[in-house]
Regions:
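Polar/charged low-complexity regulatory segments
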Residues: 1-156, 160, 165-203
């Protein structure tokens, strides 16, 4: 709804700006106003087709985002020996699914590292640790909550609850919009590797 929002609510919506912008969505209303794209975005990309799927996915995103894997992915990234990298994942991942996700994220980070340097997102490996991936996690929670609300899978009140969680996540992790944006780009790179068109922000 295009109701008047408070300054605080605008601030909270802005956590999802980068993700919303990529999909052509509105930045300053709870509604993204991209209804024609949402069945594809939610159904095909996220596997969300109803209220149950919506809540399950959003709860999972809040509970276990990329930040869950990041300390181990980064630790492995600093090592050259593949067996040592594998040991980190074997010791710390609780399931085969988590193990495979961590391995995939490490591959993507290796793939995009030079690109992130070239585009001056980062200047060193240390910057990856400094920014982390919480910006990506928060952006995804925010966007998916708004998309699910637009599809009437969850209520506006529920959407704001998730948006609040995303805001708290970002607010407690970053002191500037710049750092959050860099974290978003790094998280997106770890998600998609070189196929993510990281710097053109497509997809």
């Amino acid at each position: 709804s295009k109701s008047k929002l408070s300054v605080e609510q605008y601030k909270k919506l802005s956590i999802g700006s980068l993700y919303a912008l990529q999909q052509g969505g509105y930045l300053n209303t709870l509604s993204l106003d991209i209804k024609d794209k949402l069945p594809t975005i939610l159904g095909e990309w996220w596997g969300i087709n109803n209220a149950h799927d919506a809540r399950e996915t959003l709860d999972d995103l809040c509970r276990k985002g990329y930040d869950y894997y990041f300390p181990f992915v980064y630790e492995a990234f600093l090592l050259d020996d593949e067996n040592a990298q594998d040991d980190i994942f074997q010791q710390n991942m609780e399931s085969q699914e988590d193990y495979e996700k961590a391995v995939g994220q490490l591959q993507n980070l290796k793939e995009v590292y030079e690109e992130l340097i070239a585009y001056e997102v980062i200047t060193s490996k240390e910057d990856i640790a400094r920014y982390g991936v919480i910006g990506w996690d928060a952006g995804r929670i925010n966007f998916v909550a708004r998309a699910c609300c637009d599809m009437k899978y969850i209520s506006e009140m529920e959407a704001w609850n998730y948006i609040d969680k995303a805001y708290e996540l970002a607010h407690s992790s970053f002191t500037s919009w710049h750092d959050m944006a860099m974290s978003y780009v790094i998280g997106r790179a770890i998600w998609g590797g070189t196929n993510a068109h990281n710097l053109g922000m497509k997809g």
